[in-house]
Amino acid sequence: MSVCPAPRSPVRWLHAFTLCLLLAVLAGCVSVPKPMAGAGEDVFSRVGRFAITVTESDGKQQAVQGGFAWRDDGGSYLLDLTNPLGSTEARVEGRPGMAVLTRANGERLAAEHPDALAEDALGSPVPVTGLRDWLRGRLMAGAAPDGLERDAQGRPTAFEQDGWNARLSRYDAQGPQLLVLQRQEPGRRILVRLVITQP
């Protein structure tokens, strides 16, 4: 994945979004990150694939895909992002008061909050905090959802939070195995698709 020099270009945005997910985010060669020190019973992990498409107002599209491995103990988390061949592109490590993104080339970005880290990298907001909840099949705390729909078991299946329209489906015991997130911004529409391949 190459980075274009224009800071707001679709390719740069896609590249940075991929590194931050991730938002979020992916294929069969991905391994689950090693257990975190002090991890307790609330450990949550997901492995899967992601696809991100940005459609500009003129109809031009940019797309990127890859794999992710997410491990979260409720206090801290690790997110490894891979390219389609399985090579690690980035690792995001977060805990209260600190989020660090380390790229494969060793470059590091840090912020006090994961959403701030994503915004620094992308130039626009990304709901990293929301993904922590949405991957578990629950609503993000502190942000009232619009258009909330639930399945027969009471699990959220469709809603809008923090500017993102979310559809969650194919639930297993840990949460949804398919997440489709859409966001409309001035001049572009962002579509993020996450498919869980391992619990």
Swiss-Prot record:
Gene Ontology CC terms: cell outer membrane
Cysteine pairings via disulfide bonds: none
Keywords: Cell outer membrane, Chaperone, Lipoprotein, Membrane, Palmitate, Protein transport, Signal, Transport
Principal location listed in the UniProt entry: membrane
Function: Plays a critical role in the incorporation of lipoproteins in the outer membrane after they are released by the LolA protein.
Family: Belongs to the LolB family.
Name of protein: Outer-membrane lipoprotein LolB
Taxonomic source organism: Bordetella parapertussis (strain 12822 / ATCC BAA-587 / NCTC 13253)
